[in-house]
Amino acid sequence: MSSGHKTQPQPSAGPGDRVFTKAEPLRPPAATYTISARSKHPDAPVFGYLRNQYGNVRLAEIDSLFGFVERSELYGGRAFRQRELSDRDVEQLNNAGIGVRLPLSNHFVERSEYEKNLPFLQKYHRPGNSVIVTNDDLARWVRQDFPFYRIDASVIKNIKTHKKIDEALELYDSVVMPMHINEDLDFLEKIEAKDKITLFANAGCALTCPSKLCYISFSRFNKVGQGEIQCSRSMKDRYVMGMVDFPLQVFIDLGFHRFK
């Protein structure tokens, strides 16, 4: 601006002249997901892992990650080989409002084992984190001593009747349904507590497995870190479908919003 000229003050813009609008709260997502940290190396940054493996899922849609932290004989569902989520991962996830789900789905839990794992459970005991449980005694002990954990009934419990769902929800906060239930829309529609149900977004070999021997063998393996891992594939014929992605909008329209 050159010298010698006086400028007149401009009237301030009124609300109607502004190009921005008042910020509104973000709408909650139509669906949220609990995501597997399987095969994640503990040294890999967790948000880099999410970007590379689940880049199509917005962070606002991620409820939690489930995976191994330090070793525990309470683990089940698959064999513990090494840690997947580091302490830094857990801290960063929790700071971002994303929970950590500990897969404590071992079939066999003694009281002495539970007491041995009290420091482990205390370490991750904070609102937003959860435990995945198969053994009802373990669920009761955790409920009594660690009220901040959400307790999820594992898919391994194979809860597949409306009566069993209602009974499970007397102890558990939510129930993970077997994969094949996704194909029975009439059954799903009749579930009353849909907000406490987790359905599978995709499915692998367990969808058509006739016996699921592996889960018991994983429970035994994780007690000592060794042993035979069994699979029924060589014992019983099955139709192998590979990885199956379910059409989630069908389930959302029925009133389900939590997916794994």
Question: Can you describe what each PLM-predicted range is?
Answer:
Residues 17-164, 171-260:
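Active-site pocket-lining/capping segments in soluble small-molecule metabolic enzymes
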Residues 2, 9-12, 18:
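Intrinsically disordered, low-complexity segments enriched in serine/proline and basic residues
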Residues 7-9, 13, 23-26:
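Selective for proline/serine-rich intrinsically disordered segments
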